[in-house]
């Protein structure tokens, strides 16, 4: 991941395939990056506790870092934990599949989609290519 980021910057996501969830910190740009694979196979959660951005593969990793779990009843009832960036816990969000988030030195968090199901495939083919004989 580091080599891809050094070569392509945030365009690195065009070159990634497979399962992943990772975090990078660009010291020069003072930019934190957290990313998740296209299909969301690998989990990645985040929250802000005591003025700090916390990111982990499991929400329980936040427990020793001043995070107090509280059920998000609305998310549970609406199924938001399954269909959007909400989780079962208040103020804990998911990095969505096919997305990455950035956080600058001022704590500004931005979300970016690098892939979705409508993303054009590099290998194009037609129905006739699959038709027999």
Question: What is the meaning of each model-derived region?
Answer:
Residues 1-133:
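Cysteine-centered catalytic environments shared across enzyme families
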């Amino acid at each position: 991941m580091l080599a891809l980021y050094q070569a392509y910057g945030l365009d690195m996501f065009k070159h990634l395939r497979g399962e992943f969830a990772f975090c990078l910190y660009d010291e020069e740009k003072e930019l934190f990056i957290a990313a998740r694979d296209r299909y969301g196979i690998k989990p990645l959660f985040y929250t802000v506790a005591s003025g700090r951005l916390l990111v982990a593969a499991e929400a329980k990793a936040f427990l020793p870092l001043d995070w107090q779990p509280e059920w998000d009843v609305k998310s549970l009832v609406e199924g938001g934990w399954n269909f959007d960036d909400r989780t079962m816990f208040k103020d804990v969000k998911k990095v969505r599949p096919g997305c990455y988030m950035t956080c600058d030195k001022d704590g500004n968090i931005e979300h970016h989609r690098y892939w979705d199901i409508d993303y054009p495939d590099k290998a194009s083919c037609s129905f006739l290519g699959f038709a027999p004989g």
